[in-house]
Amino acid sequence: MRRARATALVPREFFLTSGRGISPTSPMNAFDRALMEAGIANCNLLLVSSIIPPKCRERRWKKLDAGAITPVVMAKAIGGPGETIGAGLAWAWEEEGRMGLVAEVEGHYDRRALITALDARIKEMAEARNFKIKDVKRRFEVMKVPQGVFGCVVVALVFVL
């Protein structure tokens, strides 16, 4: 008897996007505005872990259908008046192209601290897998939240199914 093979959704493309948002009403509304700026607010975002499949290629931003189930690796930071917040992703391919890794950083970070944390995390992820990685890329957003509002920064690696 033949065993059925499990079907897996394996993305073939991905793109990076980011946004910032502020709201006088709530942190959730600031997050919604950051997603709007990033161009993914009208998707049903599905958070996934930090592995880029083999042969998955990076592409330019793509408009996605409203309501689409959309897998993302996301970093987001939310803050109140006067706080500095940062979110970022670092991604890189294993030297032989077997897979890619994505590291997320989010919280109360300025630009320098965010970059340092991203570099340390992607390096440790590779070391844990005995990988050598090449061409580390980064995307990040940092914001000092204005007085009287909530702020949010978001960075997402969006898989295209």
Walk through the language-model features, giving the residues of each.
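Helix-coil modules at protein/domain termini and other flexible surface or pore-lining loops
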Residues: 1-161
